[in-house]
Amino acid sequence: MGKIIGIDLGTTNSCVAVLDGDTPRVLENAEGERTTASVIAYTDGETLVGQPAKRQAVTNPQNTLFAIKRLIGRRFEDEEVQRDIEIMPFKIVKADNGDAWVEAKGQKMAAPQVSAEVLKKMKKTAEDFLGEEVTGAVVTVPAYFNDAQRQATKDAGRIAGLDVKRIINEPTAAALAYGLDKKGGDRTIAVYDLGGGTFDISIIEIDNVDGEQTFEVLATNGDTHLGGEDFDNRLINYLVSEFEKEQGINLKNDPLAMQRVKEAAEKAKIELSSAQQTDVNLPYVTADATGPKHMNVKVTRAKLESLVEDLVLRSLEPLKVALADADLSVDEITDVILVGGQTRMPMVQAKVAEFFGKEARRDVNPDEAVAMGAAVQGGVLAGDVKDVLLLDVTPLSFGIETMGGVMTKLIEKNTTIPTKADQTFSTAEDNQSAVTIHVLQGERKQATYNKSLGQFNLEGIQPAPRGMPQIEVTFDLDADGILNVSAKDKATGKEQKITIQASGGLTDEEIEAMVQEAEANKDADKKFEELVTARNQADQMIHGTQKQIEEAGDALPADEKEKIEAAIKALEEVKSGNDKEAIDAKTQELMQAAQKLMEIAQQKAQAQQGADAGEQPKQDDDVVDAEFEEVKDK
């Protein structure tokens, strides 16, 4: 097997590494840089990637694409994509399937197609170093990437001519790079990963047992639309606002000027990590009837911090959730590792140190650690590294919609992957010949508040009373975090399978808010559960009573039948509403009205027993009375 390279496909910068002996090595690209800007430019007949693309952006803003990772696996209608449309100089358009695509040189392109250009450059960089063709790669994604985004990343690899052997989470990769050369005792580390477009936190336990290192992810959380680009945008908006106050001109209508301001803001942000003040000086940034206009704005570190403080504080909320999910306190964290270029900002470092009560380690390169860890995992898959075991987790729960609009979870968040889970469900109506399996991802009890990943039908179910058919639903989550679902009718053996497609992925806003929403809406979820239970009990009561009316036949007096049917009608009128008390009250009224049915059923049963007592029971030597105990799989 050839070398399996490790690629960190970043929002702002990308990086490639290979295993050189036992040590991961970051490779320099054709321009001599260890990281490559994730910028792609389309010029007349040529596609530029990295620094060459960045250099010509000012004169070609509409055809220079950047931060494409923020669009990968996402829908055009998503609120965050709509916000990006307002600030991006290039066109974001709606694809036929509803995905967010981009347009350059009059051509519409999918996000994986554009990201593939960066992956091609990474592939070429590795091939130049190794002197041989490279086809296998481990590509990293934010830990909080959903099914659709992971699928889209694999698609980008395939378009770039790479066989993506494994998708791994960025914080986990960083932990691999950090822990590989540390053969000491067991440690629990927190990886805080604030990159160009995404934020992740992972709590990882590193164990050393008989010379083998186990990296086990205990919990992960994050925000897929929080990163350095958002910090840049705050500074860009400030500079544009200051210029408008001074000159009365809004630069947002001038793509060329905005590209220059973007570059200047990024440069100023970096400078303010080491300096207390910087000047943003852009001569001839625009012009009007009175002549050329120049931008000259002083920006202090304190000003930048005031502009972005809420973004930094927003990153602390997922830390609390991850620690709670791992059932750990901050005191139990051995080391804190910072990953991603935005963690170079002193304010970020200070807030993280304050949260954990300890300084982060300085021996991890925030730009290179992720690619190095991916190269280590490539070595594990190729068989070159034998004493490392990686146990990653799924960031969000998977389940299906069941009766009453409830999400029934089959795989809980923070479950180690790969994993498989199955559960048996049944029909909700008599003689139901088909069921719809609606697959969901998220943490809320109410199905509509989770994201629909897709649905499919299982048809050809044999007619039977409701609750009788046995439909086995199986969720198979692979090591890349990508889901396969199957449903099987146990009676007929008919089966239907689905691999969740990229067009059904979660939106970034939904993903970042799901776990926090679940925490904040516990009371609402509890009330909803109680309402659904009341509705289901009402349904069962109506169904059972109607069946008893049929069985009673002429034995049920007409006036009693009329009374019961009126109670059924009254219950049917309220059971679809949201008033639990009204549903409970009408259910009780139906139970009272149906007393006569119970008496008739008892009389029939007694009469039957009397008839049976007159007959001699048939002996059956093969029947043995036995007690049994149900043993559930752990």
From Swiss-Prot:
Extent of Low complexity compositional bias: 602-613
Statement: the UniProt record of this protein carries the keyword Cell cycle: no
Keyword annotations: ATP-binding, Chaperone, Nucleotide-binding, Phosphoprotein, Stress response
Gene3D superfamilies the record matches: 1.20.1270.10, 3.30.420.40, Actin, Chain A, domain 4, Substrate Binding Domain Of DNAk, Chain A, domain 1
MF term (GO), any: ATP binding
Protein family per UniProt: Belongs to the heat shock protein 70 family.
Protein's UniProt name: Chaperone protein DnaK 2
Organism: Aliivibrio fischeri (strain ATCC 700601 / ES114)
